[in-house]
């Protein structure tokens, strides 16, 4: 009988694929149903953000950051604002810090709700996304009531936040927390001990801690492998040192552990939010929400009607913008997906000389080949879901 040579089978996964989370194209080399090679093709959502930022003043560059990881927009603005504040040497008043932390944690919950529920949908559970989007809708309303926009808020400004929160809004956020924890428990009940969900995620995409560091992982990907590394604790910024919360850590480094960590992180975020709400309604009830330096933060409308200097400041800030002293700085925040960093080079003008964005998803996506090799085709979606990739920040 004549020998037939068996060759591997190449297929495209995406860019139009429901589990590809946007515009991912993976070229998979399959031996039967076993994945031999994964080749991610990125750049389909490249918009030249880093170059565009160089042609905008520091204030005008802020909206670009919302459009990177558009699932949790305010966390990126936060990193950019911190970078500028370090170069300018200004600090944020405590009420402004509390509002920032409150909204950073809202963003984290927005992100984890989407990720957990769509990961469940990728492996076949159809109920969680409906619950997740219901809660996300309420959070988007909180975004809208603070900044006027549901997603691209441009709310964090260098020096603080754009506007103060109405008391009613802070109270409503406080009232939202307990029903939300009930929803998390319902999700927990539906997925955590679910036999099918466990079979699809446990022991899939295992990453040892050494490999996690070597691939440049951060965030949930590192904590899933057993390191308690969270920038909110290890390199604290804003008023996180004053907050009481725990860092969930996995021990197997598989998709299931990463799912469990995200579930617990939502509870911890709610805990941080509760502390912020208590302080915003308690001893930090009144106070400035942004730095009072008129050379950086625009004056209030009321002041502009009375004072010529305020009017001049306002005009200069919105036409020319403030000049940032020459220097370079790296500021990183613990975004929901990992360490989101901004490396900013200032040359003393009103525009950044260079702004490099360190997107956590980029490092995670490049390990796709390493994580999927030897797994089955059906496991690719499970691994991809647990990486938590959004293409706005990967392609920039």
Swiss-Prot record:
Known catalytic reactions: a quinone + NADH + 5 H(+)(in) = a quinol + NAD(+) + 4 H(+)(out)
EC number per UniProt: 7.1.1.-
InterPro entries for the chain: NADH_Q_OxRdtase_suD, NADH_UbQ_OxRdtase_49kDa_CS, NDH1_su_D/H, NiFe-Hase_large
Compartments reported by the entry: Cell inner membrane
GO cellular component: plasma membrane
Enzyme class: translocase
Disulphide connectivity of cysteines: none
UniProt topology in membrane: Peripheral membrane protein
Major place of residence: membrane
Keywords: Cell inner membrane, Cell membrane, Membrane, NAD, Quinone, Translocase, Transport, Ubiquinone
Molecular function per GO: NAD binding; NADH:ubiquinone reductase (non-electrogenic) activity; quinone binding
Source organism, top-level taxon: Bacteria
NAD as UniProt keyword: yes
Protein family according to the UniProt entry: Belongs to the complex I 49 kDa subunit family.
UniProt xrefs under NCBIfam families: NuoD, PRK06075.1
Function of the molecule: NDH-1 shuttles electrons from NADH, via FMN and iron-sulfur (Fe-S) centers, to quinones in the respiratory chain. The immediate electron acceptor for the enzyme in this species is believed to be ubiquinone. Couples the redox reaction to proton translocation (for every two electrons transferred, four hydrogen ions are translocated across the cytoplasmic membrane), and thus conserves the redox energy in a proton gradient.
Subunit structure comment from the entry: NDH-1 is composed of 14 different subunits. Subunits NuoB, C, D, E, F, and G constitute the peripheral sector of the complex.
Protein name: NADH-quinone oxidoreductase subunit D
């Amino acid at each position: 009988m004549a020998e037939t040579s068996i060759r591997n089978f190449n297929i495209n996964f995406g860019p139009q694929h429901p589990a590809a989370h946007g515009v991912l194209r993976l070229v998979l080399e399959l031996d039967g149903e076993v994945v031999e090679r994964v080749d991610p093709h990125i750049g389909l959502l490249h918009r030249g953000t880093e170059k565009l930022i160089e042609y905008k003043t520091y204030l005008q560059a802020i909206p670009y950051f919302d459009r990177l990881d558009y699932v949790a927009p305010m966390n990126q603005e936060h990193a950019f604002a911190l970078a500028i504040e370090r170069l300018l040497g200004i600090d944020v008043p405590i009420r402004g810090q509390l509002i920032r932390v409150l909204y950073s944690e809202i963003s984290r919950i927005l992100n984890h709700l989407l990720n957990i529920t769509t990961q469940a949908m990728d492996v076949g559970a159809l109920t969680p996304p409906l619950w997740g989007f219901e809660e996300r809708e309420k959070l988007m309303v909180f975004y809208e009531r603070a900044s006027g926009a549901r997603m691209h808020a441009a709310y964090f400004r260098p020096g603080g936040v754009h506007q103060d929160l109405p008391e009613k809004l802070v109270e409503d956020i406080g009232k939202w927390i307990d029903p939300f924890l009930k929803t998390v428990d319902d999700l927990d009940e539906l997925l955590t001990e679910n036999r099918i969900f466990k079979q699809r995620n446990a022991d899939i995409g295992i990453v040892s801690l050494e490999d996690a560091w070597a691939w440049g992982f951060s965030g949930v990907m590192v904590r899933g492998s057993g390191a308690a590394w969270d920038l909110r604790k290890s390199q604290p910024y804003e008023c996180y040192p004053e907050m009481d919360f725990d860092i969930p850590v996995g021990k197997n480094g598989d998709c299931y552990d990463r799912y469990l960590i995200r579930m617990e992180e939502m509870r911890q975020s709610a805990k941080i939010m509760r502390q912020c709400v208590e302080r915003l309604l308690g001893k930090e009830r009144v106070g400035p929400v942004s730095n009072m330096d008129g050379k950086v933060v625009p004056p209030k409308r009321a002041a502009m009607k009375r004072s010529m200097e305020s009017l001049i400041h306002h005009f200069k800030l919105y036409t020319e913008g403030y000049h940032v002293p020459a220097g370079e700085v790296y500021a990183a925040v613990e975004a929901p997906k990992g360490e989101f960093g901004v490396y900013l080079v200032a040359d003393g003008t009103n525009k950044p000389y260079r702004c490099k964005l360190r997107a956590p998803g980029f490092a995670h996506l490049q390990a796709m080949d390493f994580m999927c090799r030897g797994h089955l085709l059906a496991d690719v979606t499970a691994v991809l879901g647990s990486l938590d990739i959004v293409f706005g920040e990967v392609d920039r």
